[in-house]
C-alpha cells in the first residue's frame, strides 16, 4: 500500500454495454481497488450505476448526466465535463482506462493502453477505428502523467512504433475473476450445454468477437480438417459477439455437412465457466493480443487451451497451454494431436488452472495504486 494515497477518479464511461475485455478489466479493477481500500470515485454511464454500486460499495459512484452513449458524445463529455468534475471532486488523479484522456484536466492522468495492434496490424481493425486509436495512443504517450500496459509484449511493441521507451511504461498484468471463471460444477456444464443446444456432443470451444485478429476462419478450416475422418467428431462452438470478419461466413460455408459448427452468439456470463470448463479444449488461435484475457479465463476454468505464441499470449499461457501456428494446417495438426491424447489434455488443464491462480485482481489493484501515486508525484513536480 502506498504511503500517501491520492484520490482517484476512474472514468468508466468507455465500457460498452456488453462489457467485453475492457469492461471486464474496468469492472474487476474497480472491485479490487474498492476492496483494497483505495480512495476512488467511479464515473459511469447511467445504465452501469447500479453495477458499480454493487462492485464498489465503499466508493462513490457518479452516473453521467448528459448522454455519453455514442463515441462522439463521450469524447465531448470527456474533454469538457470530466475535467470540471475532477476539479469539483478535488481528484488528484484521473484514470482513463481505454486509450483516450481529458487533455485539460487539473489532475494527474493515468491512461491504460491495451495493445499496439492499431499500429502493427492495422488491417485487423476497421480503418476508422485504427486511425482513431493510433492518434489517441500517441497523444496519451505524450500527454499523460503515466501510461499503463498489460504485458511486456505490448510495452515492447509500443516502443517499436512510437517514441516511447518500454521502460517508461508501467506494466501491470490483468487478473482473473475467480467467482465467474472457475472449475464448473456438473450442473453448470449442463446449463451451458442447454443454452447452446448441444445435448451430449463433446465440443471444441471458442469465446471471443468474430473479428479478423481472432483468426476464426483458420480455426474453422483447421477444425474441419482435424475432425472430418473421426468416427464421432466433436462440434465446434463459436461463442461471442458477431464481428466484422467477412471471411468467417466463407469458412463456415465450406464445412462438410456431417460436421457441426454452432454459432452460439453472446452467452450470459453465468454460463461461461460451464462452457469453457466443459469443453474438450478451448481453441484461441489469435493473431495477437495485448494481454489475452480469454486465454487466462479459460485456464481458470480448468480447460485445456490451444493458442498461439503471438505477442503477449506466452506471457499468460507459459508452459500450461498448447501452442500452434496461425494457419489452418497448423491449427488442424494441433487439434488432432490434442483430441487424440486425453491424458495430455488433462495434464494441460490441471497446469493451466494452477498457473491462472498467479494472476489476481488484488495484485493488479495494488500495482495500480502504486501507479496512481507515481503519476500524482510526477504531476506535482511538473507544476
Segments the model singles out, each with a brief description of its role:
Residues 1-383:
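Carbohydrate transferase catalytic cores enriched for Leloir-type hexosyltransferases
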Amino acid at each position: 500500500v502506498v504511503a500517501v494515497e491520492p484520490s482517484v477518479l476512474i472514468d468508466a464511461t468507455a465500457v460498452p454495454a456488453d462489457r467485453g475485455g475492457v469492461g471486464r478489466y474496468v469492472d474487476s479493477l474497480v472491485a479490487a481497488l474498492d476492496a483494497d481500500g483505495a480512495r476512488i470515485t467511479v464515473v459511469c454511464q447511467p445504465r452501469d450505476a447500479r453495477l458499480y454500486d454493487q462492485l464498489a460499495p465503499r466508493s462513490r459512484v457518479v452516473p453521467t448526466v448528459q448522454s455519453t452513449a455514442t463515441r462522439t458524445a463521450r469524447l465531448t463529455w470527456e474533454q469538457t465535463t470530466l475535467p470540471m468534475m475532477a476539479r469539483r471532486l478535488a481528484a488528484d488523479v484521473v484514470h482513463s482506462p481505454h486509450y483516450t484522456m481529458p487533455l485539460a484536466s487539473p489532475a494527474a492522468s493515468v491512461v491504460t493502453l491495451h495493445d499496439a495492434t492499431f499500429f502493427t496490424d492495422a488491417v485487423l481493425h476497421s480503418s476508422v477505428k485504427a486511425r482513431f486509436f493510433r492518434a489517441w495512443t500517441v497523444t496519451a504517450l505524450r500527454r499523460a502523467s503515466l501510461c499503463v500496459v498489460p504485458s511486456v509484449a505490448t510495452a515492447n511493441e509500443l516502443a517499436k512504433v512510437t517514441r516511447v521507451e518500454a521502460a517508461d511504461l508501467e506494466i501491470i498484468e490483468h487478473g482473473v475473476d475467480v467467482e465467474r471463471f472457475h472449475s464448473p460444477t456438473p450442473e453448470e456444464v449442463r446449463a451451458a450445454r442447454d443454452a447452446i443446444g448441444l445435448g451430449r456432443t463433446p465440443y471444441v470451444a471458442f469465446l471471443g468477437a468474430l473479428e479478423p485478429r481472432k483468426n476464426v476462419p483458420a480455426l474453422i478450416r483447421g477444425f474441419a480438417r482435424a475432425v472430418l475422418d473421426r468416427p464421432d467428431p466433436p462440434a465446434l462452438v463459436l461463442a461471442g459477439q458477431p464481428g466484422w470478419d467477412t471471411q468467417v461466413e466463407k469458412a463456415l460455408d465450406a464445412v462438410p455437412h456431417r460436421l457441426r459448427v454452432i454459432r452460439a452468439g453472446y452467452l450470459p456470463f453465468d454460463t461461461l465457466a460451464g462452457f469453457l470448463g466443459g469443453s474438450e479444449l478451448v481453441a484461441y488461435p489469435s493473431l495477437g493480443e495485448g494481454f489475452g484475457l480469454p486465454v487466462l479465463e479459460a485456464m481458470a476454468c480448468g480447460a485445456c487451451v490451444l493458442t498461439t505464441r503471438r505477442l503477449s499470449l506466452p506471457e499468460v499461457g507459459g508452459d500450461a497451454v498448447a501452442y500452434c501456428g496461425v494457419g489452418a494446417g497448423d491449427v488442424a495438426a494441433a487439434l488432432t494431436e490434442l483430441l487424440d491424447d486425453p491424458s495430455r489434455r488433462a495434464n494441460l488443464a490441471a497446469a493451466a488452472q494452477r498457473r491462472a491462480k498467479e494472476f489476481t485482481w488484488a495484485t493488479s489493484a495494488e500495482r495500480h495504486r502504486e501507479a496512481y501515486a507515481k503519476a500524482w508525484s510526477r504531476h506535482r513536480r511538473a507544476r
